[in-house]
């Protein structure tokens, strides 16, 4: 293995190993501080982060507001308190010189307010902000206000060029690095564009090279690119290390830090990760954000897949092939279906899927009465955790705080499920984000006999090339 040398990033020399930030409440100050203390760049998530009571117990985020706007205000307050708690713990563990980054999603509810609130209250504790999920144009000016480095997450050179031309060129001195996130391999939400096929992955080398060529045109040849998604053993990336064509490269690990002693996820979740097989992680379109995302196949995803399959197109009047009448809801309001679809509907109803829910796309999906009640309750309980949500039709922009469409029952409340799984909820019935290489836990001798390393042991291991 080539020697893995420190690189210059954010004004200092660090190991080219970056911890990937995972919200809700999975990348904590504990994990971040230990990673930074080991010489890499630690990252805690500022997405609905946990705060703690005087005894160190997690304060569960309970909402009391009458409207979703009121609850959104509570969410922002929880977000700032949680971000501060994680920043303090990260800095305590990292020591004065460890590099601590906060990860936020630009499309999370109240992103800008939470980011400013945490940076305001945590002066001197945070060295950098990593931000993806959308086009975070304002990241540069916020970084300048608080004098921290910024690290946009992009999945193409084109996205970076747009950010650079619109705002980053004005604050180039604080651009610490650019994260290239492989949209086919990374865990969690992915930046697949409309021109890319979820089923046709493209190898990262050419895409990262294009990004570097764009960056060189802007005079950014020495700004590191951080490769995220699909990184496991560094010996597999030897042709990327010290490669003059690519320039300085660091590597981001998001999935591997899930299985560490400091990782806050449940033992059941850790053990499940250690037994995954190739193909157990699914790139799927059900997220209320509108982005594709990658998660472990389980009953939760299977329910969403089947719900989306139990779907028929409807018309408000008989037209074309829509000639079969069907009554929707308690008042049996008439819509028209294709006769073949009516047969399918009768079969679903016979199997217990008796509730027809309308979608924004002039279709009906069929669910059980219990499922229907749960969907409705989750939509009603919305606390505005995204800038806009297709599941509940919330948007954080006034005057009426709705996206103007019907709430979409083909999706789910992401805040509810991520909070639940992060705090010992059942792993079969929640969204379990992971990268596509997670099956390698089961093949990597490092984890044999169910071994769970500390974060520092993991960093040492990665430095051996494996």
Label each region the model flagged.
Residues 27-30, 233-237:
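Short glycine/serine/threonine-rich phosphate/pyrophosphate-binding segments
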Residues 226-233:
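A short glycine-centered flexible hinge/capping loop motif at secondary-structure junctions
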Residues 18, 185-204, 214-222, 234-466:
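Conserved active-site-proximal phosphate/metal-binding subdomains
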């Amino acid at each position: 293995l080539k020697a893995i040398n420190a690189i210059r990033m954010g004004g200092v020399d660090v190991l080219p190993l970056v911890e990937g930030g995972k919200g809700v409440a999975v990348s904590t100050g504990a994990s971040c501080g230990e990673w930074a203390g080991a010489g890499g760049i630690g990252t805690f998530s500022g997405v609905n982060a946990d705060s703690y009571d005087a005894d160190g117990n997690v304060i569960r985020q309970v909402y009391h507001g009458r409207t979703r706007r009121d609850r959104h205000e509570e969410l922002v307050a929880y977000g700032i308190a949680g971000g501060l708690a994680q920043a303090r713990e990260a800095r305590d563990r990292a020591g004065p010189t460890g590099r601590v980054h906060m990860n936020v999603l630009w499309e999370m509810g109240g992103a800008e307010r939470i980011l400013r609130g945490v940076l305001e209250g945590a002066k001197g504790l945070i060295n950098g902000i990593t931000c993806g999920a959308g086009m975070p144009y304002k990241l540069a000016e916020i970084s300048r206000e608080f004098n921290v480095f910024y690290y946009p997450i992009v999945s193409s050179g084109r996205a970076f060029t747009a950010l650079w031309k619109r705002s980053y060129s004005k604050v180039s001195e604080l651009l610490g690095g650019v994260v290239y996130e492989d949209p086919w391999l990374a865990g969690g939400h992915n930046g697949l564009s409309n021109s890319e096929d979820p089923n046709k992955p493209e190898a990262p080398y050419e895409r990262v090279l294009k990004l570097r060529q764009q960056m060189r045109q802007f005079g950014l040849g020495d700004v590191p690119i951080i490769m995220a998604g699909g990184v496991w053993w560094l010996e597999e990336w030897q042709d990327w290390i010290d490669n003059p064509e690519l320039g300085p490269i660091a590597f981001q690990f998001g999935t591997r830090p899930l299985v560490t002693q400091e990782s806050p996820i449940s033992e059941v979740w850790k053990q499940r990760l250690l037994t995954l097989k190739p193909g157990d992680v699914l790139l799927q379109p059900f997220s209320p954000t509108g982005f594709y995302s990658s998660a472990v196949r389980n009953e939760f995803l299977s329910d969403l897949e089947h719900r989306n399959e139990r779907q028929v197109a409807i018309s408000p009047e008989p037209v074309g092939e829509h000639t079969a009448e069907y009554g929707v809801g308690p008042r049996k309001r008439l819509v028209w279906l294709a006769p073949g679809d009516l047969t399918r509907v009768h079969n679903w109803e016979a199997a217990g899927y008796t509730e027809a829910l309308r979608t924004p796309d002039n279709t009906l999906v069929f669910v059980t009465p219990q499922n229907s009640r749960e969907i409705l309750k989750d939509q009603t309980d919305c606390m505005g955790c995204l800038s806009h949500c297709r599941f509940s039709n919330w948007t954080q922009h006034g005057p009426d705080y709705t996206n103007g469409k019907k709430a979409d029952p083909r999706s789910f409340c992401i805040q509810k499920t991520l909070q639940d799984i992060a705090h010992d909820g059942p792993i079969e019935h929640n969204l379990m984000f992971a990268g596509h290489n997670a099956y390698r836990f089961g093949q990597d001798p490092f984890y044999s006999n169910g071994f769970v390393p500390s974060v520092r042991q993991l960093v040492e291991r990665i430095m051996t090339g494996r």
